[in-house]
């Protein structure tokens, strides 16, 4: 697909569509739906790990709902474009914590961020992560589903990772900052090989297993 907006649902084997359009396109099997946050830049540059990751989710019997974002609006995608059974129940009881929730929001059973960094502000919010924690926790608390950060290493190649472990700055991006928001079970999915990002199959299996 050729993305033309800053935030959109991605389906590699068919044209991009909104959550609502995809959900109305047919009956969904009773499989867990996983919201996945992806870098828009990586979608545009056709990084090979994105279709590989989505395919692995599908092969595991999961329904991926991938959204590409610029990085700084991850909290908007989670807050407005994703909903859950818990949030639906709360809204039916009059507890509308997220007034900006889209009527076409996709219902998910878990959320996976392949970006790292704080949920609110992304890379731009790293220096103010502590100040935004309450906002992030409020957004995630309204959804009340697992929030997992499973990101490839964007500033470290696979060779150095396997030999020396995850570097200091990369560790902050992948572990420390997301954990402030309440992320659980962080997984490093892969890393750089030249200019491209590749997945490590064993790490992907840990995520979806």
Regions found by a protein language model. Name each.
Residues 1-209:
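An N-terminal assembly and electron-transfer interface module characteristic of large anaerobic redox
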């Amino acid at each position: 697909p050729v993305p033309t907006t800053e935030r959109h649902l991605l389906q590699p084997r068919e044209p991009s569509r909104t959550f609502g359009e995809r959900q109305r396109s047919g009956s969904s099997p009773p499989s867990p739906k996983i919201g996945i946050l992806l870098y828009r830049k990586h979608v545009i540059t056709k990084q090979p790990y994105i279709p590989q990751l989505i395919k692995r989710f599908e092969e595991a019997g999961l329904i991926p709902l991938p959204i590409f974002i610029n990085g700084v609006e991850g909290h908007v995608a989670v807050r407005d474009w994703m909903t859950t059974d818990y949030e639906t129940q709360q809204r039916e009881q009059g507890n509308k914590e997220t007034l900006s929730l889209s009527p076409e929001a996709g219902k998910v059973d878990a959320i996976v961020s392949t970006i790292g960094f704080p949920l609110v502000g992304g890379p731009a919010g790293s220096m103010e992560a502590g100040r935004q924690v309450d906002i992030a926790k409020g957004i995630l608390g309204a959804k009340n589903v697992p929030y997992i950060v499973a990101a490839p290493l964007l500033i470290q190649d696979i060779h150095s990772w396997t030999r020396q472990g995850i570097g200091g700055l990369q560790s902050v991006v992948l572990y420390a900052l997301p954990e402030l928001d309440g992320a659980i079970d962080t997984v490093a999915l892969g890393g750089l090989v030249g200019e491209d990002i590749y997945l490590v199959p064993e790490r992907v299996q840990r995520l979806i297993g």
